Amino acid sequence: RGSNLTIHPLRNIIDLFYVG
């Protein structure tokens, strides 16, 4: 997911852990 990158960079990184 990269849509969160535009909203929040850190959220994108955390999302990677949640998805993974």
Swiss-Prot record:
<keyword id="KW-0064">Aspartyl protease</keyword>
<keyword id="KW-0378">Hydrolase</keyword>
<feature type="glycosylation site" description="N-linked (GlcNAc...) asparagine">
    <location>
        <position position="4"/>
    </location>
</feature>
<keyword id="KW-0325">Glycoprotein</keyword>
<dbReference type="GO" id="GO:0005576">
    <property type="term" value="C:extracellular region"/>
</dbReference>
<dbReference type="GO" id="GO:0004190">
    <property type="term" value="F:aspartic-type endopeptidase activity"/>
</dbReference>
<keyword id="KW-0964">Secreted</keyword>
<protein>
    <recommendedName>
        <fullName>Pregnancy-associated glycoprotein 71D</fullName>
        <ecNumber>3.4.23.-</ecNumber>
    </recommendedName>
</protein>
<keyword id="KW-0645">Protease</keyword>
<dbReference type="GO" id="GO:0006508">
    <property type="term" value="P:proteolysis"/>
</dbReference>
<comment type="similarity">
    <text>Belongs to the peptidase A1 family.</text>
</comment>
